């Protein structure tokens, strides 16, 4: 809410304070306080199944209902449960990619996955405080749009070498491949100049996440990082925009690869920006897991150890929505170790692949979905983070209409 505050466990000091004051405990202390009756969650040290019964407050879901409070539920415990991803630490089945299954989440089951519920709660809470203390003022952050891109496969045909192109042609004969390789037409995944023009036109500051696996595999199929084409592509973007690491699928199986891939990317950024290695290594490095493949707490513990400072993986790789029920950056709290870390988590709510492959939406349906996320984020002055892949925004016939819908959406963001 953008306000300064002081924490105290001194009940007499609390009573004597003459300004706005919030009592978070199991009993009231002062007549002029704003009282929130606490749930036990924040005072527990073990991780266990919680009894959660949702109800409706101001047309939105809530839980950890209170009886004698000035607020209808324990907003602190409920927010912590969602933002810490408490439920992901409990025993659960995983999906086909080894990830937490979104359908097991409270947000999915209770129908609020499409809302930044914590941001909404905070706004309601601030209004309640204002009712009790008219002098209480909040300073909300401003709405922010942050476009991000995952470069899993930089080019469809170019720079893949003779053997890969022959193999690809034998599997799927295509005149387009021949035209691209002879320079007659542009590679269908090459949308970089168009994106650059779009960013300049609307004054956007995107982040590009590059997959730089040292070798290809079933799920890692990018141009190899030692090739000039990949170096040049990353260098071009690092000179203009923020560049992050897209840790490979292989790095999820071989724990030693994450650090190596980060070092590879840092070397490329260093070459682009002409800065000493020690400075390049100290610059904050954002990351987003390939296929959104990570589990808590191990996945984030590995990022911390590898020196990844900002993670952009907090969302689902199977459905759009707010995985942590929030649209604001937060520090990751390691529930297993019970400590706040320095890892910044930047939650996203939309990924093109979810709309296309999982939700089976067409461009018009996807535009409406995006406009919904734009609206709900603007209403609470939150940050809207989207994920797009370059193959969706080029000229591949499979994705006809998706480039145009993205441009329409960007225009709507700026209105």
Regions found by a protein language model. Give the residues of each.
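Active-site proximal loops enriched in glycine and acidic residues that flank catalytic Cys/His/Asp
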Residues: 210, 247, 288-291, 307-316, ...
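Metal-dependent polysaccharide deacetylase catalytic core of the NodB/CE4 family, i.e.
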Residues: 153-157, 193, 200-294, 390
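Glycine-centered flexibility motif
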Residues: 2, 111, 240-244, 319-323, ...
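Acidic, His- and aromatic-enriched active-site or binding-groove loops in soluble protein domains
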Residues: 167-176, 226-246, 307-315
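Terminal accessory/targeting
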Residues: 1-225, 328, 335, 339-415
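Conserved hydrophobic/aromatic pocket- or pore-lining residues that grip, position, or stack substrates
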Residues: 150, 246, 303
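Catalytic domains of cell-wall/extracellular-matrix polysaccharide-remodeling enzymes
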Residues: 251-339, 397-398
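Residues within well-ordered alpha-helices
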Residues: 195, 230-233, 299, 373
């Amino acid at each position: 809410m953008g306000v300064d505050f002081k924490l105290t466990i001194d009940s007499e000091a609390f009573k004597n304070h003459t300004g706005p004051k919030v009592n978070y405990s199991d009993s009231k202390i002062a007549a002029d306080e704003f009282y929130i009756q606490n749930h036990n969650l924040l005072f527990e040290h073990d991780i266990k199944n919680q009894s959660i019964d949702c109800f409706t407050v101001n047309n939105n879901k809530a839980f950890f209902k209170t009886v004698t409070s000035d607020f209808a539920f324990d907003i602190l415990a409920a927010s912590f449960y969602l933002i810490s991803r408490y439920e992901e630490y409990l025993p659960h089945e995983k999906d086909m990619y080894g990830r937490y299954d979104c359908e097991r989440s409270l947000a999915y089951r209770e129908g609020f996955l499409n809302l930044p519920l914590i941001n909404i709660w905070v706004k309601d809470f601030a209004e309640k405080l204002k009712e009790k203390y008219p002098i209480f003022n909040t300073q909300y952050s401003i709405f922010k749009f942050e476009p991000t891109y995952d470069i899993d496969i930089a080019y469809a045909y170019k720079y893949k070498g003779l053997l890969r192109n022959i193999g690809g042609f034998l599997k799927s004969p295509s005149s387009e491949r021949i035209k691209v390789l002879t320079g007659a037409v542009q590679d269908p995944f090459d949308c970089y100049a168009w994106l650059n023009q779009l960013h300049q036109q609307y004054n956007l500051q995107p982040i590009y996440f590059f997959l730089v696996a040292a070798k290809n595999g079933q799920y890692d199929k990018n141009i190899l990082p030692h090739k000039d084409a990949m170096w040049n592509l990353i260098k071009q973007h690092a000179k203009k925009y923020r560049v992050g690491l897209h840790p490979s699928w292989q790095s999820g199986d071989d724990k030693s690869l994450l650090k190596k891939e980060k070092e590879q990317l840092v070397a490329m950024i260093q070459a682009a920006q002409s800065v000493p290695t020690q400075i390049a290594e100290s610059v904050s490095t954002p990351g987003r897991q390939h296929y959104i493949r990570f589990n808590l707490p191990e996945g984030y513990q590995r990022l911390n150890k590898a020196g990844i400072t900002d993670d952009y993986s907090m969302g689902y790789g199977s459905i759009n929505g707010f995985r942590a029920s929030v649209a604001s950056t937060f520090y990751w709290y390691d529930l297993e170790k019970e400590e706040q870390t320095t890892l910044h988590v930047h939650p996203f709510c939309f990924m093109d692949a979810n709309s296309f492959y999982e939700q089976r939406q067409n461009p018009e349906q996807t535009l409406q979905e995006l406009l919904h996320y734009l609206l709900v984020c603007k209403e609470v002055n939150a940050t809207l983070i989207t994920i797009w892949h370059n193959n969706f925004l080029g000229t591949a016939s499979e994705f006809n209409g998706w480039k145009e819908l993205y441009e329409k959406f960007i225009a709507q963001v700026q209105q």
